[in-house]
From Swiss-Prot:
The keyword Nuclease applies. Residues 341-361 are annotated as: Disordered. InterPro entries: 5-3_exonuclease, 5-3_exonuclease_C_sf, Flap_endonuc, HhH2, PIN-like_dom_sf, XPG-I_dom, XPG/Rad2, XPG_DNA_repair_N. Pfam families: XPG_I, XPG_N. Belongs to the XPG/RAD2 endonuclease family. FEN1 subfamily. Keywords: DNA damage, DNA repair, DNA replication, Endonuclease, Exonuclease, Hydrolase, Magnesium, Metal-binding, Mitochondrion, Nuclease, Nucleus, Phosphoprotein. Residues 337-345 are annotated as: Interaction with PCNA. Its EC number is 3.1.-.-. Structure-specific nuclease with 5'-flap endonuclease and 5'-3' exonuclease activities involved in DNA replication and repair. During DNA replication, cleaves the 5'-overhanging flap structure that is generated by displacement synthesis when DNA polymerase encounters the 5'-end of a downstream Okazaki fragment. It enters the flap from the 5'-end and then tracks to cleave the flap base, leaving a nick for ligation. Also involved in the long patch base excision repair (LP-BER) pathway, by cleaving within the apurinic/apyrimidinic (AP) site-terminated flap. It comes from Giardia intestinalis (strain ATCC 50803 / WB clone C6). This is Flap endonuclease 1.
Length: 361
């Protein structure tokens, strides 16, 4: 779910924090990429004519590998050094959200079957995307492909987003690429959306310190805004959308004060609402020490033999097409990169600061 409505809210009340970038802006930079979200996007968007994911003759899904190979090539062509980060074990507090997602997938599967029986193929195609789940097998296959391509990856202790952010705070990387606004709630100094997506989609960068400055919020106040909007660890309260949440935090500065000022109405709705635990999970998530990750971080040459064995012999990719793609990747890595001037500047301060600027009304 991410943070409900946060992207649109930031565009409206803190537009200076949002920048449109060319991919060349990230030349020579190390970027942590939320791999779990990325694989889901590949499986739901790289599809056959009927809307189902690409698969080999054994029925094994291959869309995630097609997408991952293409993304690695595009990043290499732009001179970007990626670190892919996969989800580890989700916190127990997220089980409710995961159960809701499971139920939603099952409901979508039933609707899809009904649409197919009624001959409504377009509706069935739309519903097929809602039935997708990224499995451990998908992740292991992606990790194996990255191994053959010489690209480093990390399996997080918990949430991939939290691990990415911990790495950004310790300057192991210079930004976090994800579509999920949770990254800002975890405190990432820089969120990059649509990185190397292909097509005409603009890369959007959101700078957290600028968000805080524009809003006149401390990080703690911003985090309370995120929780009040609704997140994976705590659903939003009935009747409170992103704009209302923003106005309440502007006025009261914390969730406790919001509840206390409402003469018991919200407090009643908030009974058993785990906002305190949500704060703890965002501020102190389970992560691997970024300093330990940095010690072993290495980009290696492509192992063409292993890549061909996996993609062509095992996953049934077309041999000629795969050879050409690997040639393209090797050439991209060797070619000197033309970087934009601003790509050489250091990233801004990695820790959100308490700001004292005037609050926007």
């Amino acid at each position: 779910m991410g943070i409900r409505g946060l992207a649109k809210l930031i565009e409206e009340v803190a537009p200076a924090a949002v920048s449109k970038r060319l991919i060349q802006h990230y030349c020579n930079k190390v970027i942590a990429i939320d791999a779990s979200v990325m694989l889901y996007q590949f499986i739901t968007t790289i599809t056959s004519g009927d809307g189902t994911a690409l698969a080999n003759s054994s029925g094994e899904v291959t869309s995630h590998l097609v997408g991952l190979l293409a993304k690695v090539i595009r990043l290499a062509e732009a001179g970007i050094k990626p670190i892919f980060v996969f989800d580890g074990k989700p916190p127990e507090d997220k089980q409710g959200e995961l159960e809701k997602r499971r139920q939603a997938r099952e409901a979508a599967e039933l609707e899809q079957q009904k649409a197919e029986e009624e001959g409504n193929l377009e509706r069935a195609k739309q519903l097929s995307r809602r039935t997708v789940k990224v499995t451990q097998q998908h992740c292991k296959q992606a990790e194996r492909l990255l191994d053959t391509l010489g690209i480093p990856y990390v399996v997080a202790a918990g949430e991939a987003e939290a691990q990415c952010v911990a790495m950004a705070k310790e300057r192991v990387c210079e930004g976090v690429a994800s579509s999920d606004l949770d990254v800002l709630a975890f405190g990432s100094p820089c969120l990059i959306r649509n990185l190397a997506q292909g097509g005409d989609r603009e890369i959007v960068e959101i700078n957290l310190n600028t968000v805080l400055k524009e809003l006149g919020f401390s990080y703690d106040e911003f985090l309370d805004l995120c929780i009040l909007c609704g997140c994976d660890y705590a659903n939003s309260l009935e009747g409170i959308g992103p704009k209302t949440a923003y106005k309440l935090i502007v006025k009261h500065r914390s969730i406790e004060e919001v509840l206390a000022a409402d003469q018991g109405k919200l407090a009643e709705k908030a009974l058993n609402w785990p906002y305190v635990r949500a704060r703890e999970l965002f501020k102190n998530p389970a992560v691997i020490d970024p300093k330990e990750i940095k010690k072993t971080l290495k980009w290696k040459p492509v192992n063409r033999g292993e890549a061909m064995q996996f993609l062509v012999e095992e996953m049934e990719f077309d041999r000629e097409t795969t050879e050409k793609k690997l040639d393209k990747l090797v050439a991209a890595r060797k070619k000197p990169k033309q970087c934009t001037i601003d790509s050489f500047f250091s990233p801004r301060s990695s820790n959100p600061e308490v700001t004292k600027t005037k609050v926007k009304q």
